[in-house]
Amino acid sequence: MAEKRFTAGIGAANMDLHGRSRAALILHDSNPGFLHTSPGGVTRNILENLSRMGERTALFSAIGNDLYGREILASGEAVGMDMSHMLRCPDCGSSSYMALIDPEGDMFIGMSDMRILEHITPDWL
């Protein structure tokens, strides 16, 4: 029997939150704008695109038992990624990234919380 080839990725699977201001940003104040969430993370994004092109993929990452983790899992499965190798950390929050974009489309600031990735160790792999 021929061995089936697949691409495996080890790394981040985040929930991304992008906010784009509708006007010049005012520091230390609430700013009107548009907010959008989507699954992200460089490794996850690459594997998603390969899956959409018909390649077999498997993601090795970590998610928490939370809304973001469930969405990351469901979105990967929806495009055919093998998500069975995900480390589930019930006491951790899933990895997340936030970017604030100014009205011209340039990033003003970004922030990430990827502490959960510390659980991806050589012993786990």
Model-based region annotation:
Residues 38-45, 90, 117-121:
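Short secondary-structure boundary/capping elements
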Residues 85-94:
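A short, structured active-site edge motif that brings together acidic residues
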Residues 61-65, 87, 102:
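Short glycine-rich, polar/acidic loop-and-turn segments at beta strand-coil junctions
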Residues 66-67, 92-93, 117:
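Short secondary-structure capping/turn micro-motifs that flank functional sites
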Residues 88, 99-125:
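Conserved phosphate-binding/catalytic loop of the ribokinase/pfkB sugar-kinase fold
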Residues 1-62, 67-81, 97:
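Glycine-rich phosphate/adenosyl-contacting loop at the front of the ribokinase-like
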